[in-house]
């Protein structure tokens, strides 16, 4: 079956959609990390002519809903009135077909759990799901994962912990995170996770993640940040460049080199963890290689090299597991009545070829993908997109 990416930021962006399609993804969930369209009806209408892959959307809390109600300060908690406004906007988005409310708590460190819980309860009441980019107060902070567990337990909502290895990029941190999540699961919490094939994460330079105080707390150095978009793409950060871009181009994406490689595979030692890309809105030749290489790398590293899982289990993680987790009854399987979304690949050669800006080509197509089909029609032949309008909007 076609691969299902539960955590991305395509949101109708064609260049990024083609990268997803070329690596075998046929369905992608956008609006993650608290960043999404607010007017879902208008967004869905804008996609009426089709897209590279099938798209499902969450409505985002931590950037989009907060900004829509006038909350521009990432360090200020919402008032009760602002929470009610966000609930009304989220309800409207879910009535239009959004799959739930997403959170990017790292990006609004001042938001109180009260508002998160309120939106979680709304999402649960409407049958939605809450992906959560957890809030890290330090690199070794486990309170962040407890917020995800509490959201599931207190709000009664299904929670998807986003890009697990980015949040907990050391093996011992993952052990602690798994222990806390499984404690909650044993008490009835419905929690799953997704994770990527890199520990080096990307975020906008102007976000709270890269505030100087937070960089000091996390012990990140300027020369560990690689610019991945814009006119300085491929350059390593300096203090002067940091100050210039924060002032003049805060949306510039940078990659923070952190974590340990062993954590990548270790994140998939639990059977409720599925692969994801965290792909952003990238113009050609720009961005993080995860947008072009994640799923092929998952198969190469976890199956062919490390033999951590066999082929049937790896395929399940990339197809049936996300379909069942998200409630996609016609996706993730090849059976009578299911949607004819599928990918044909060579298990001996499948691999990601993209690399970081300045070190390689961020959008290089993968190896080993023979063809990709959506709805019974061919979308990809080898490394060429032959039809980028087969994807449909999937409403909750």
Residue ranges and their predicted role:
Residues 265-272, 277-278, 342-390:
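C-terminal cap of metal-dependent C-N hydrolases
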Residues 2-10:
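Metallo-beta-lactamase
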Residues 92-148:
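Divalent metal-binding pocket/active-site signature
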Residues 255-258, 264, 306-315, 323-362:
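Acidic, glycine-enriched loop/beta-strand segments at the rims
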Residues 7, 24, 55, 97, ...:
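Divalent metal-coordination and catalytic microenvironments
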Residues 9, 13, 33, 60-64, ...:
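Active-site beta-loop-alpha junctions enriched in small/polar residues
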Residues 58-59, 71-80, 84-106, 163-307:
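Active-site neighborhoods of metal-dependent hydrolases
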Residues 8, 14-102, 189-191:
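Divalent-metal coordination cores built from histidine and acidic residues
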């Amino acid at each position: 079956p076609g691969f299902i990416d539960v955590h991305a930021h395509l949101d109708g962006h064609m260049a990024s959609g083609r990268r997803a399609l070329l690596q075998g993804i046929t369905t992608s969930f956008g609006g993650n990390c608290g960043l999404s369209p607010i007017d879902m009806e208008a967004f869905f209408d804008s996609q009426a002519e089709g897209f590279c892959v099938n798209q499902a959307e969450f409505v985002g809390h931590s950037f989009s809903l907060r900004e829509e109600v006038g909350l521009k300060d990432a360090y200020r908690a919402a008032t009760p009135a602002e929470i009610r406004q966000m609930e009304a906007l989220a309800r409207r988005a879910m009535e239009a077909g959004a799959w739930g409310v997403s959170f990017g708590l790292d990006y609004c460190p001042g938001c109180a759990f009260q508002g998160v819980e309120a939106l979680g309860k709304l999402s649960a009441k409407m049958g939605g799901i809450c992906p959560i980019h957890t809030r890290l107060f330090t690199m070794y902070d486990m309170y962040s994962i407890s917020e995800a567990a509490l959201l599931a337990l207190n709000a009664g909502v299904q929670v998807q912990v986003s890009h697990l290895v980015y949040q907990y990029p050391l093996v011992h941190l993952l052990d602690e995170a798994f222990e806390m999540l499984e404690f909650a699961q044993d008490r009835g919490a419905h929690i799953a996770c997704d994770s990527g094939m890199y520990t080096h994460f990307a975020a906008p330079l102007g976000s709270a993640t890269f505030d100087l105080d937070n960089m000091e707390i996390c012990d990140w150095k300027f020369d560990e940040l690689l610019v991945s978009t814009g006119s300085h793409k491929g350059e390593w950060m300096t203090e002067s460049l940091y100050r210039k871009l924060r002032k003049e181009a805060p949306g510039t994406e940078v990659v923070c080199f952190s974590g340990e490689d062993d954590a990548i595979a270790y994140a998939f030692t639990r059977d409720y963890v599925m692969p994801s890309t965290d792909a952003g809105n990238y113009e050609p030749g720009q961005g993080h290689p995860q947008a072009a290489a994640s799923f092929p790398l998952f198969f190469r590293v976890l199956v062919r090299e490390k033999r951590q899982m066999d082929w049937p289990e790896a395929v399940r993680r990339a197809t049936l597991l996300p379909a069942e987790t998200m409630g996609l009854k016609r996706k993730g399987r090849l059976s009578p009545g299911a949607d004819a979304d599928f990918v044909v690949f060579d298990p001996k050669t499948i691999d990601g070829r993209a690399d970081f800006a300045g070190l390689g080509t961020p959008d290089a197509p993968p190896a080993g993908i023979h063809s990709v089909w959506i709805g019974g029609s061919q979308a990809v032949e080898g490394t060429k997109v032959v039809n980028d309008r087969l994807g449909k909007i999937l409403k909750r």
